[in-house]
Every structure is written in C-alpha cells, then in structure tokens.
A protein has these predicted regions:
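Bacterial N-terminal signal peptides that target proteins for export
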Residues: 2-13
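N-terminal signal peptide c-region/cleavage motif recognized by signal peptidases
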Residues: 19-24
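Boundary of Sec targeting at the N-terminus
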Residues: 26-28
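Sequence context surrounding c-type heme c attachment/ligation sites in exported
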Residues: 32-64, 68, 72-73, 77-165
Length: 165
C-alpha cells in the first residue's frame, strides 16, 4: 500500500470516528433522563400561572414585573410541551413520574390538549402585553380549564398528595 493510500484511509477512519462521536454527543438523552427536566419545566409553568393569579387576587396588578414575564414563561414553556413526553419516559422508565400511561396510549388526544395549551398560552401573553385586566382574568380561567382537561386523564392523582402545601 502506498503512503498516499494509507493517509487517505487514516483520514477516512478519523472522519468516521469524529462523525460517530458527534452523533453520540448530540443524541437525545435516554427517556428516563428527560423526566426530571420535564417536571421542572412544568413546575415553572405552574408557578408562573400561580404568580399571575396572585397578582389578580391582590387587586393591583404589576404588569411589567409580574404578569408579562410570567405570561412569557407560560408561552415559552408551552411551545415545547409536546416534546417533553417521548416514548419510554412514563412509568416504564422506573423513575418517579406523575405521567400516566394514558399519555402514550392516547397520544393523539394528548397532542390535541397540548396544542390547545399552546394556543391559550399565546392568548395569555397577548392579553398580558395589552395590559387588559378583564382579558387576563378570562384567559387565566380558560388556561386553568385547559390544564385541568389534560391533568385529569393524564396526570397521576398522586401528584396532588405529594405536592400539598
């Protein structure tokens, strides 16, 4: 084998190694590893909605420091919600999760619910940015119903017991 052919083979092997390493480095984490980040993001969304509700209850709404940024959080998180439930990230992952198997058994309905949340969250951000108090109150109720419509069939009742304040 000539030196030139040897160099070409070495370069080809090195390129294959780099491509394989890059693929492994950028691959999605295993489903079980996605449960905790999913739970954290969902808690962020719930906390943001609670902060907005608390502002409404106060009777004096701080739009710029409380409502608008929290509405943005809800909208930003909602955009990705359907990506947070890959197959294998339910109870079969053997990691504590409140996600019920029904999510994957009825994924078309779950997707529909997720898209409704995305639309409601976008509307929440719109009324927040407009500083529309009546619109905000109505949209918070709407998004609460959307959350409940998904939580009832797809989240374990253990969540409420484990997260009592």
């Amino acid at each position: 084998m000539s030196m030139s052919a040897f160099r070409i083979r070495c370069v080809a092997v090195a390129a294959l190694f780099v491509a394989t390493a890059a693929t492994v480095a950028f691959a999605d984490p295993p489903p079980a590893a996605q449960i905790k980040p999913r739970q954290d993001k969902l808690r962020d969304m719930g906390g943001a909605l609670k902060a907005i509700t608390d502002e409404i209850k106060k009777g004096r709404i701080d739009w710029d420091n409380a409502v608008i940024p929290n509405a943005q959080t809800v909208k930003d998180r909602s955009v990705y919600i359907l990506n947070w439930f890959p197959k294998g990230s339910g109870p079969e992952a053997h990691v504590k999760t409140y996600a019920l198997p029904a999510i994957w058994q009825k994924f078309d309905d779950f997707t529909k619910q997720g898209k409704q949340l995305q639309a409601d969250a976008a509307k929440l951000q719109q009324v927040a940015n407009a500083k529309d108090e009546a619109g905000l109150k109505a949209q918070v109720q709407t998004i609460g119903k959307t959350c409940k419509a998904c939580h009832d069939p797809y989240r374990s009742p253990d969540y409420e017991k484990d997260n009592e304040e």
